[in-house]
Amino acid sequence: MNLRSVFTVEQQRILQRYYENGMTNQSKNCFQLILQCAQETKLDFSVVRTWVGNKRRKMSSKNSESGTATTGTSLSAPDITVRNVVNIARPSSQQSSWTSANNDVIVTGIYSPASSSSRQGTNKHTDTQITEAHKIPIQKTATKNDTEFQLHIPVQRQVAHCKNASLLLGEKTIILSRQTSVLNAGNSVFNHAKKNYGNSSVQASEMTVPQKPSVCHRPCKIEPVGIQRSYKPEHTGPALHNLCGQKPTIRDPYCRTQNLEIREVFSLAVSDYPQRILGGNAPQKPSSAEGNCLSIAMETGDAEDEYAREEELASMRAQIPSYSRFYESGSSLRAENQSTTLPGPGRNMPNSQMVNIRDMSDNVLYQNRNYHLTPRTSLHTASSTMYSNTNPLRSNFSPHFASSNQLRLSQNQNNYQISGNLTVPWITGCSRKRALQDRTQFSDRDLATLKKYWDNGMTSLGSVCREKIEAVATELNVDCEIVRTWIGNRRRKYRLMGIEVPPPRGGPADFSEQPESGSLSALTPGEEAGPEVGEDNDRNDEVSICLSEGSSQEEPNEVVPNDARAHKEEDHHAVTTDNVKIEIIDDEESDMISNSEVEQVNSFLDYKNEEVKFIENELEIQKQKYFKLQTFVRSLILAMKADDKEQQQALLSDLPPELEEMDFNHASLEPDDTSFSVSSLSEKNVSESL
C-alpha cells in the first residue's frame, strides 16, 4: 500500500485552483496541467495525479448522492445513477429487506438511457417495470404489498434471455458487474433476481442497459420474456431499487432464445454477525429512501472513510490467500472451498463468496454452452476479468475454458482465448483508480543477474534489446513482460534520480569483459543481501521518489553497526563475512567507470612519455652538435692566435655542416645570444686549457 500524502493549506489551495481550471482527470489531456501543478506545489507528479483521481472519485460520489451526473464523462444523454448500497457494519435488525446478515454486497452502476418514445402499460403489483429499448421507460410504481416481488416484461422484440437454468446453491450470491472504459452503443445484460428460500431456486427477469455495469443479484433462473412471478412473504429476498424516472432501455442482442446459466456465484464482503434464517416470521425492513441516496462504492456515505477502507482492503490481499476449487457435475456447477464447507440443501444461508465478471465485451452471450472451471487458472479476455473472493481476500481460483467452451460475441462472432492474471476486485470493480498490479519479488541473485544484463546494454524496451530480454527471462524462468517492467522501472528510477540511462546495445549479451558470474555464487547470504538495501525502488515501482530517498538514507544507518562490529572483531582477529557489507554490483559499476578513466589517463601518459623521449633525443643531438662546434671553434681560435695559416685553411676547408649552411655574406653585425655565448664559452675554455 502506498504512503498517504499530507498536503499543506497552500498546496490544497493550488490543487483546488488547478482542478477548477480543468485538471479534472488523469488522461493525457491534463498532463501539462498536472505537471505545472506539481512544479508549483513542489510535489511529485504521481502524487498530484493520485490527488486528481481521488478528487474525481469524491466529486462523483457527491454528484451521485445529489442525483446529478458524474463529471468528466461525455454522454449523449444525461446520466442516471442507480445506487444500491448496503452498510456492512449495520446490525442485522437494521438491514434492508434485500440483504441478509452475512451477505452484504455493494451494488452500483451508472446508466445512460437512450431516447424513449411511447409509454406502455404498467403492472399494478410490480415494484419495477422493465421495458424494451426505445419503447417503454422504467417506472417504479406503488405497491400494495412490499413483500411481493413481481417482474413483468412486455414482449415487443425478440430479446435474448435464458430459461431452465437452475442453481443448486443454497448459500450463494451473485454479483456480475461490468464496466466499459469506452462509451459506445453496446449493451450489457442486467439480471435482477429473487431468491426462493423454499427450494433454493430463483426466478428473475432480464433487462439490457447500455454502457455501464450489469449486476445480477442472487442465484437466478432466467425465465422466458412475458412471464410474471409473485412470491410469498416467507420467500422474500432482495428488493430491486430503481430511481423514479430512470429509462434504461432494452436492445435486441442479435441472438435467438438460448440458455444462459450462471452456475456458480459468490459475494464479496462479509460481516461478522451471525447468520439468521429468513422465514415467514423473519423481520423484514422495507427498503428506505436512504438506500437510494448513497453513491458508488459507498458503505457509510463518508468518502474519506471509504477511501481508507478501500486501501485497507487492498492491503489485505497479500496476507491470507484463499483457494477455491471448481468442478462440474451434471447440468450444474458446484463450488468447494477449502475454508468453507457446503451446507446441506435444508440450509438457506448465503455464504460470502463472489464471482465478479467485469469488462465483458458488448453483447456477450453464452449460447448453449457449459463451462468447465478448473483450478489454478485465471479468466479474462482482452476486456473481461473473473474474480473469486472468500473472506474478502484475494483468491487464487482458476477458471479456464475447455476447447469448445468459449465466449461467443454476438456482433462479430469472435472467440477470445482466456488467459491472464487476477487483479484486486474491490479496487477495479467500483473505482476509476488504477488497479494494483501483481508485484514480482525478485531474489537477490535474480536482481544481480538483471543488473548484470543492464550493465551489458539491456536498457531499452525496444527491439534492440529483445535478445537480451529473452535470454534473461529464460535464465530467470520468468515472463518477458516482467523483465520489461523491471527495465521500465529502473529507467524511471534513473530519470527521477537524475542519472543518465546508459545507451542500449543490440545483439546477445557479452560478459567477456565482466567478472565471472561464479564469483557471485560463492558469496554468502550475508554478502549477497548487502546490495539489496538500496534496491527497494526496483521492487517498489509505484512508490514516489520520496520513499526511494528514504531508503537510501536508511542505508548508511544499517552499514554503520556492521562496520562498528567489524572493527571490534578485527581487534580480536575474528571478522565474519556476515558483518561486512559488500556492494558487489555497485562496485562493479564503479570499477568499470574507474577503469575507463584509468585507460584514458594511461593513454595520455603514454603520449606524454613519448613526447618527453623525443625531446630528450633532440636535446642529445643538439648537445653533440654543440660539442662539435665547440671543438671547431677552439681549434680555429688556436690557429688564429698561433698565426698558423695552414691550420686555418684546413679548418675552414672542413667546416661542420651547420656552418656550411650559414650565409656569411649577410651576417648580422651583432651576433645572436647563442653564438655569443658559444664563442665566449669557447674562448673561456681555450684560455683555461692554455
UniProtKB/Swiss-Prot annotation:
Gene Ontology BP term (one): regulation of transcription by RNA polymerase II
Coiled-coil residues: none
Record key words, sorted: DNA-binding, Homeobox, Isopeptide bond, Nucleus, Repeat, Ubl conjugation
Keyword Manganese: no
Polar residues compositional bias, start-end: 113-123, 674-690
GO MF, one example: RNA polymerase II cis-regulatory region sequence-specific DNA binding
Entry-linked SMART domains: HOX
Residue ranges, compositional bias (Low complexity): 64-76
The organism's place on the tree of life at top rank: Eukaryota
Family annotation (InterPro entries): HD, Homeodomain-like_sf, POU_domain_TF
Start and end residues of each stretch annotated as Disordered: 55-76, 112-132, 501-539, 664-690
DNA-binding region: 3-63, 435-498
SUPFAM superfamilies, sorted: Homeodomain-like
Subcellular location: Nucleus
Cross-link (Glycyl lysine isopeptide (Lys-Gly) (interchain with G-Cter in SUMO2)): 135, 140, 144, 163, 172, 194, 212, 221, 232, 613
Disulfide bonds: none
Name used for this protein in its record: Highly divergent homeobox
Organism: Homo sapiens (Human)
